[in-house]
């Protein structure tokens, strides 16, 4: 194993560790907070988090073993199962992000009718469709024996070893990426650009009110005026930064792998194995970044984390106080005798 392989193995180990901790923390927040569970986005977050954890526990370790051993890390049946999960979880992750963007769009563009349009039942229906859509492709690949170990990515994933099936496999793979990656990307762009448009409209209204107030308040201190203008500037940039993060992480994590798969199918140019594994690692890194992008940085999840930490520390302090009380009573008893 050379330095490249060691670096890729280290990247995978780090991704596994961060993904387990962050997604596990999101699950704890969902279990702890009834307020979060009552909201429709909680179902999308739960679906995304469970998929990320399953990918972290099954697919990432097998890819790590493939990178270290430079060969298929498990038997054919286990590898086919892992390839089935890899295909399903990739599509499910992309479609779940599209569902979350639709929820944000409805919440921002139709705030008064949001509760009527996005109920828990509607969210459950969207999750069920996501599963059905995502299951279609691995089920078809399993029936056509297009699941196995792919040496270029050191992973159990979609692959075809028969040259006579190359065209059919290329069409199938293109359809899979078009109906998962491209479809989700189009939905993300449409919904978040609508959200950005509404956010900028509200910012303009607030800016007009702010400027009118500053004009009327002649005796206002210059430092207060500067703070108002700085807050106005931050308000303009806040929505743009968030939406850029949502779409940017999606592209950075998934686009290299999807493009590599398509270039592999439709080009005769050789692709380096290290780049293949790196593109797969980038796709895996989405599982580690999702909790921060969609959950843990939000106010409700931060509050739930604080409550969990307070509960843990309170239990420890009560336990230590109890132990101190027991030792104190043991020291007093012999004296009273």
Curated annotation (Swiss-Prot):
**Compartment list:** Cell membrane
What are the transmembrane regions?
11-31, 48-68, 82-102, 124-144, 169-189, 246-266, 277-297
Q: Which Pfam families match?
A: 7tm_1
Found, by tissue, as follows: Exclusively expressed in the brain. Prominent expression is detected throughout the entire neocortex at all rostrocaudal and dorsoventral levels. Strong expression is detected in olfactory and auditory sensory areas.
Q: Which PROSITE patterns match?
A: G_PROTEIN_RECEP_F1_2
Which cellular component appears as one GO term in the record?
Answer: plasma membrane
* Molecular function in Gene Ontology: G protein-coupled receptor activity
Output the InterPro entries linked to this UniProt entry.
Answer: GPC_Orphan_Receptors (IPR051880), GPCR_Rhodpsn (IPR000276), GPCR_Rhodpsn_7TM (IPR017452), GPR26/78-like (IPR049579)
Predominant place of localization: membrane
- Topology within the bilayer: Multi-pass membrane protein
Residues on Extracellular side: 1-10, 69-81, 145-168, 267-276
Q: Which UniProt keywords apply?
A: Cell membrane, Disulfide bond, G-protein coupled receptor, Membrane, Receptor, Transducer, Transmembrane, Transmembrane helix
Q: Which GO terms describe its biological process?
A: adenylate cyclase-activating G protein-coupled receptor signaling pathway
- Paired cysteines (S-S): 79-156
- Whether Phosphoprotein counts among this entry's keywords is no
The yes or no answer to whether the keyword Nucleus is present is no
**Cytoplasmic topological domain residue ranges:** 32-47, 103-123, 190-245, 298-337
Q: What does this protein do?
A: Orphan receptor. Displays a significant level of constitutive activity. Its effect is mediated by G(s)-alpha protein that stimulate adenylate cyclase, resulting in an elevation of intracellular cAMP.
Could you say which protein family the record assigns here? Belongs to the G-protein coupled receptor 1 family.
Can you name this protein?
G-protein coupled receptor 26
